[in-house]
């Protein structure tokens, strides 16, 4: 199965790029989206310097995080150059 990688703009204004997995069984109000290898995008910087792991490794070593899809304002397909840099940085 191919990874689904998207740019997510969250309601709090953060912009992330991440692999996304859907949770098949969940309770209403519980997280229903898994982000794998999420990275924060600093839109003021170029792709090489504008991606940082999210949350920071000083906070957790986990590479997966669950969120409510309600926290996502929109999702878009990443620009090919952004996708390429993301794949380099997570490998």
Regions found by a protein language model. Give the residues of each.
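Conserved RNA-binding domains used in RNP assembly and mRNA/RNA metabolism
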Residues: 1-91
């Amino acid at each position: 199965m191919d990874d689904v990688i998207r740019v997510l703009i969250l309601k709090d204004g953060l912009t992330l790029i991440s692999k996304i997995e859907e949770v098949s069984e969940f309770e209403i109000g519980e997280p229903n989206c898994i982000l794998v290898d999420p990275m924060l995008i600093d839109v003021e910087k170029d792709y090489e310097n504008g991606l940082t792991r999210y949350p920071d490794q000083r906070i957790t070593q986990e590479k997966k995080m669950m969120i409510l899809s309600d926290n996502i304002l929109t999702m878009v397909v990443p620009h090919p150059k952004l996708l390429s840099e993301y794949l380099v940085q997570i490998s």
